[in-house]
């Protein structure tokens, strides 16, 4: 079922400036905070895929543009997190507003984070720091 990322009773976090990096944040932390802030403002619909067959897989739909993005979230620092958007692929942060929206949705809905290794083996492109091809061995 679709869930929005915004709630009326949410407590507001301190606003992060788009123009000046706060002294208490690294450049990476600042950029991720900006994406989290954008995720809080935008009205995304989040669909969780079949948790038995595809644990950790989500679809994020922008309610204004109707663009849909595939997101895989396996935990805060997981190397297997992924989003199909260009920001995720080019920023080398390992995050984007869609991934941040999923994290907010999981937190607000008290959902379980699937941090386990998938059963299948795959060859994938890692977008963190620098692009590299990686092999993930599945559990089967």
Residue positions per predicted region:
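Long, low-complexity, compositionally biased intrinsically disordered regions
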Residues: 1-140
